[in-house]
Curated annotation (Swiss-Prot):
It is found in: Cytoplasm. It comes from Lactobacillus johnsonii (strain CNCM I-12250 / La1 / NCC 533). The keyword Ribosomal protein does not apply. The gene is acpS. GO terms for molecular function: holo-[acyl-carrier-protein] synthase activity; magnesium ion binding. Its main location: cytoplasm. One of its GO terms (biological process) is fatty acid biosynthetic process. The keyword Magnesium applies. It catalyses: apo-[ACP] + CoA = holo-[ACP] + adenosine 3',5'-bisphosphate + H(+). This is Holo-[acyl-carrier-protein] synthase. SUPFAM superfamilies: 4'-phosphopantetheinyl transferase. Its cofactor is Mg(2+).
Amino acid sequence: MIRGVGIDSVEVERMKKIVEKGDKFAKRVLTPKEFEQYQQLKGKRKVEYLGGRFSLKESFSKAMGTGLGKYVGFQDIETLWDDLGHPVMTSTKFSGNIFPSITHDDHEIITVVVLEELN
């Protein structure tokens, strides 16, 4: 049964300015494993990665119906690449199936997260 669907978007230019300021925002938003992947990237790909992970976490919290804050925090949600480069999302706050989707162009990063409860 579908528990929730969350959608979010982030402007690439906004995220580029954040990345240019240093790693403070990235360290707050990304889990240690995500940050490790992030540090391996450069330029545009680094901006897309941070913006994508931020947006996916926003989408997840919207699908949960809580938003980010008291119940769900950035460190409770992790999205890593599988062997084929697909995003695989896990969370300490949800035990069902999580289906993340991410797309981006030169201007916008858009994410969708579908949560499926297991019976």
